[in-house]
Structures are given as structure tokens and as C-alpha cells.
């Protein structure tokens, strides 16, 4: 996994679920892989994205009928169809080659908009290139999972200021009045747990001391992969929530 491994592991959910078309609920559309929602995509866009990810044309063609279907219509589509699946390698490719560029650009745009409207509370001249790997991973995950940083003003401001004590107060995500227990727990362990974060910083320093510099983003992703390899995803993942749901809100 090249980038944003925390988000990837969270989005694939229960083992095998993401490899078949499924309906996450709410206002989402038919979804496959790590959050590829076809509810607001055109047939041509779906076909191009899926084949670019290495999915065979026959499977991609079978999925283009899910275009523009959301809510109950998407749920019915999933219930009426079977025998469509992709491989683990294909869903990784879909994430890395299609979804990461798409949501990274959304994150960059939303940060610029947020900074413009909160100039008095964020660092001067802050932009995507000035952020640490930790900041990028967090903000990318919130855009990918919830759709909007604007729904989390206290958290976004705290992340941009690297005020981790305040982030620890506001990081929890809720949906329909229920906390996303597993995602919140893993988020804290990876990005906020003082002991774990300190361990990562020490490992980075050791690598530099041995003249083996590792890019911060790459090191962070490697450590997240190791964290998930020690965990049982199938028994602990939260139910996937539609990205554009109005039910997302910040813990205050």
C-alpha cells in the first residue's frame, strides 16, 4: 500500500465485503472496493475507472448499470444481482490509482477553503505542501469518510495547528447518534496515542541516524500496515456509513 493505509484498511471493512457490490446505507450508491461509490458517477466514468484499476471489461460493464442509483434504488440493485466480484489486488489498485488522487485533490481544495474562511485561527500560509504526514493522513481520512472538513471545524483547526490535545477532544466520529467505535479506537491508537506516536518518532530518528532516511508519509503508512496486521478487522469494523450523509457530526 503506497498511501493512506489507515483509510484503506477502514474502508475495506469486513473481510470480503468490499470485493462485491454492496450498499452501505443512507444516501449512498452501490459501492465496491474501498469506498468506490457509483451513485453519482456516469456509466463511462465507472467503466474507465474500473478498467484503469485492472478490472476486466466484462465486470466493469456489469457494474455500469449501477450508475446514478442511490438509497433504496441502490439497495434493490445489490439485492437483485450476484456473481460480481473483484480481487484484493484490483481493489488496492482502485484505491491507489483512482480514489486517492480524487480524494487527495478534494482534501487540498477543502483545506484551502477552510483556511480562507478561518484565517484568524490557523497558521499563516498553511497549505497542503506545508503539512506533515500525520496531518495529511488525518485530514484525508475525514474528507474520504465524511465528505467535508467543514463539518469538523474544531478538529480541522486543531490539526492544522498541530494542537494534538485539542484533536484528542474532538476526533470521535458519530453517525445516527452512535459512535464509530472501531474507527475511533484505531484512529486514536494510530494518530493520538502518546506512547505509539513517540515510538514512531523514535523509529524515524533511528532510521535517520543510520543514514537510511525514509519519507515521513511512507514510514507512517508502513507502521499503520503493521498495526492492522495485529488486529482482527473482520470482528471489529464499524458498519460503513454513506460519505455524504448529513448524520456525520463532531464530538463537542
Each language-model region and where it sits:
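Catalytic and substrate-binding regions of cell-wall glycan-acting enzymes that process beta-1,4-linked
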Residues: 135-179
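Extracellular cell-wall/glycan-interacting regions and their flexible linkers
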Residues: 1, 198-252
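Acidic, aromatic-lined catalytic clefts of primarily extracellular/periplasmic carbohydrate-active enzymes
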Residues: 1-136, 166-213
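Residue-level recognition of short, well-ordered coil/turn positions
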Residues: 147, 163-164, 195, 231-232, ...
Amino acid at each position: 500500500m503506497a498511501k493512506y493505509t489507515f483509510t484503506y484498511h477502514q474502508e475495506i471493512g469486513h473481510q470480503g465485503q468490499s470485493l462485491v457490490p454492496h450498499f452501505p446505507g443512507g444516501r449512498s450508491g452501490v459501492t465496491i472496493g474501498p469506498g468506490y461509490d457509483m451513485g453519482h458517477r456516469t456509466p463511462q466514468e465507472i467503466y474507465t475507472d474500473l478498467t484503469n484499476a485492472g478490472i476486466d471489461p466484462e465486470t466493469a460493464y456489469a457494474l455500469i448499470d449501477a450508475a446514478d442509483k442511490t438509497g433504496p434504488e441502490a439497495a434493490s440493485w445489490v439485492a437483485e444481482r450476484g456473481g460480481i466480484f473483484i480481487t484484493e489486488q484490483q481493489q488496492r489498485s482502485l484505491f491507489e490509482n483512482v480514489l486517492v488522487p480524487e480524494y487527495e485533490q478534494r482534501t487540498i481544495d477543502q483545506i484551502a477553503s477552510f483556511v480562507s474562511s478561518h484565517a484568524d485561527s490557523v497558521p499563516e500560509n498553511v497549505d497542503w505542501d506545508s503539512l506533515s504526514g500525520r496531518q495529511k493522513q488525518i485530514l484525508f481520512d475525514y474528507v474520504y469518510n465524511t465528505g467535508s472538513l467543514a463539518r469538523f471545524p474544531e478538529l480541522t483547526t486543531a490539526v492544522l495547528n498541530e494542537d494534538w490535545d485539542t484533536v484528542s477532544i474532538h476526533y470521535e466520529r458519530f453517525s445516527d447518534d452512535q459512535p464509530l467505535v472501531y474507527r475511533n479506537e484505531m484512529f486514536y491508537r494510530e494518530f493520538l496515542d502518546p506512547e505509539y506516536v513517540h515510538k514512531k518518532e523514535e523509529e524515524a530518528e533511528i532510521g535517520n541516524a543510520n543514514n537510511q532516511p525514509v519519507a515521513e508519509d511512507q514510514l507512517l503508512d508502513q507502521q499503520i500496515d503493521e498495526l492492522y496486521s495485529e488486529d482482527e478487522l473482520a470482528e471489529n469494523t464499524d458498519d460503513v456509513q454513506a460519505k455524504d450523509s448529513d448524520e456525520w457530526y463532531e464530538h463537542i
